């Protein structure tokens, strides 16, 4: 059998690596039992995720809704979306926390007009698109935008005064409030509307149903401590049309 590649690049941090590795090993073994040549270990992807997601040998990975609807919708198949049981979000959905420093004078969304905005990536649904849509609906316009490269970097830019605000993925924010003491210096000023969460994808449309079943079973079979650490409730199916209907910010 020809080996394929797999990666879980989203939400990775040292504290969660054992849990992600356990999720993969369980998924891998179930896939191999189905005759699918799942790789021994996950591939570490440190840059150019968009190219990785378009590899023809991509067995399984996780992407963001923005690149899916703009670049990947005709190149990959959806496998399923993790449900993290986020407050005020439907299953498999998430939203963005608009954060400011705890000692900042800004106390409402209206106060963000002209604020310097830290963004992990302009192809991010939670870090770029959703915050801008939220601001535009409120009749606001952010000031200068600074690209940070990661949600945790955006939060640090706000904490250190390099930016006034940032949109942080709710799952990432949950992890930060769990593992990073310094975020106590930040507060949530508001939230964006929920949108479909970060989906698992594959290059092989024919394998998508089997991948979804195996991944869902692997989640259910994870050791409780590790699944709890990820705050992972299960896998849900969200139609591609729901991803494609999410609004982009006006130019």
Residue spans for each PLM region:
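A ligand-binding cleft/hinge motif common to bilobed small-molecule-binding domains
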Residues: 59-73, 159, 164-184
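Extracytoplasmic small-molecule ligand-binding "clamshell" domains
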Residues: 1-69
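Periplasmic-binding protein-like
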Residues: 80-82, 88, 94-95, 181-216, ...
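Hydrophobic/basic alpha-helical segments enriched in Actinobacteria
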Residues: 158, 162, 207-210, 223, ...
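Short helix-initiation/N-cap motifs at beta->coil->alpha
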Residues: 38-52, 64, 83-86, 144-156
């Amino acid at each position: 059998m020809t080996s394929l590649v797999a990666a879980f690049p989203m939400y990775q941090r040292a504290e969660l690596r054992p849990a992600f590795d356990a999720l993969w090993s369980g998924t891998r073994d179930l896939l191999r039992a189905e005759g699918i040549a799942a790789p021994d270990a996950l591939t570490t992807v440190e840059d150019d995720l968009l190219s990785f997601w378009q590899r023809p040998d991509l067995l399984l990975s996780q992407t963001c809704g923005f690149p899916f609807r703009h670049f990947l919708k005709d190149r990959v198949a959806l496998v399923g979306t993790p449900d993290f049981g986020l407050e005020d979000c439907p299953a498999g959905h998430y939203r963005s926390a608009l954060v400011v420093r705890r000692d900042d004078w800004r106390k409402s969304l209206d106060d963000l007009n002209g604020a310097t905005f830290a963004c992990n990536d302009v192809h991010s649904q939670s870090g770029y698109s959703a915050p801008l849509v939220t601001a535009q609906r409120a009749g606001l316009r952010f000031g200068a935008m600074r690209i940070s490269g990661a949600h945790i970097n955006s939060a640090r830019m706000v904490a250190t005064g390099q930016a006034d605000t940032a949109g942080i993925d709710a799952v990432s924010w949950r992890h930060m409030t769990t593992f990073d003491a310094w975020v106590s210096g930040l507060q949530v000023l508001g939230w964006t509307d929920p949108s479909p969460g970060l989906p698992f994808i594959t290059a092989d449309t024919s394998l998508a149903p089997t991948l979804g079943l195996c991944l869902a079973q692997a989640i259910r079979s994870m050791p409780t401590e590790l699944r709890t650490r990820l705050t992972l409730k299960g896998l849900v199916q969200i139609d591609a049309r729901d991803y494609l209907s999410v609004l982009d910010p006006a130019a």
